[in-house]
A protein has these predicted regions:
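Thiol-based oxidoreductase modules, predominantly thioredoxin-like and allied folds used
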Residues: 22-27, 47, 58-88, 97, ...
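N-terminal leader/targeting and pre-domain segments
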Residues: 19-39
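Serine-hydrolase catalytic core recognition
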Residues: 34, 42, 76-79, 101
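Bacterial Sec-dependent N-terminal signal peptides
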Residues: 1-21
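Short active-site neighborhood of thiol/selenol oxidoreductases, capturing the structured segment around
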Residues: 39-50
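Non-catalytic, surface beta->alpha helical segment in thiol-disulfide oxidoreductase systems
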Residues: 98-139
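Non-globular targeting/processing and membrane-anchoring segments
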Residues: 136-175
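Hydrophobic heptad-repeat coiled-coil signature
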Residues: 52-55
Length: 175
């Protein structure tokens, strides 16, 4: 019986570790850039505010999911930055954050945003958002350039619609 209880406890402990959500680093912007360069990963920034309801929903219901944590922890150096305090104020200005939550994916070498998304997202949309930041033909920078150039290829239009929906830009996503 003791062995059974021990094995069950061990199983529960392993399940808890395996289901870990996003591990946000608690460090400065300079430290995050250094870590990202060393780990050869882009930086994922969750810009939030204390008063933002959708930010709280993402923090409690999406960032804590094991599948989300596994993907984001494997592919990004993750930061949570309060856009109204400390260095968050300047970083929010730098990346033109105008609503919350806003998710910015940054190349640590150039410090340029490679993908920007936001709004309250479900698990699938948030995983798509992260995957898009890793695919040069699905980043917001590329999609916006293609949209301005008048690209009308069906595969582009589908990617652009998904991106617009992830920005909660209903008018653009329904075009």
């Amino acid at each position: 019986m003791k062995k059974l209880i021990f094995l069950f406890s061990l199983f529960i402990a392993f399940q808890a570790v395996a289901q870990e959500g996003i591990r946000f680093r608690h460090c400065s912007w300079e430290e995050a850039k250094a870590m990202a360069k060393k780990e050869k990963k882009p930086i994922f920034i969750d810009f939030y505010t204390q008063w933002c309801g959708p930010c709280l929903n993402m923090a409690e219901n999406i960032f804590t999911l094991g599948s989300v944590g596994n993907f984001y922890n494997d592919h990004f150096v993750c930061l949570k930055i309060d856009a109204e305090t400390g260095e968050g104020v300047e970083l929010a200005k730098k990346y033109e954050v105008a609503s919350f939550p806003t998710f910015v994916f940054v190349n640590p070498k150039t410090e340029k945003a490679i993908h920007i998304s936001g709004s309250n997202q479900d698990r699938e949309t948030f995983l798509f958002t992260g995957a898009s930041a890793l695919d040069p033909k699905k980043t917001s920078v590329y999609l916006m350039e293609q949209q301005k150039a008048g690209n009308t290829k069906p595969e582009f239009l589908l990617d652009y619609a998904y991106y617009a929906a992830s920005r909660y830009n209903r008018a653009e996503s329904e075009k």
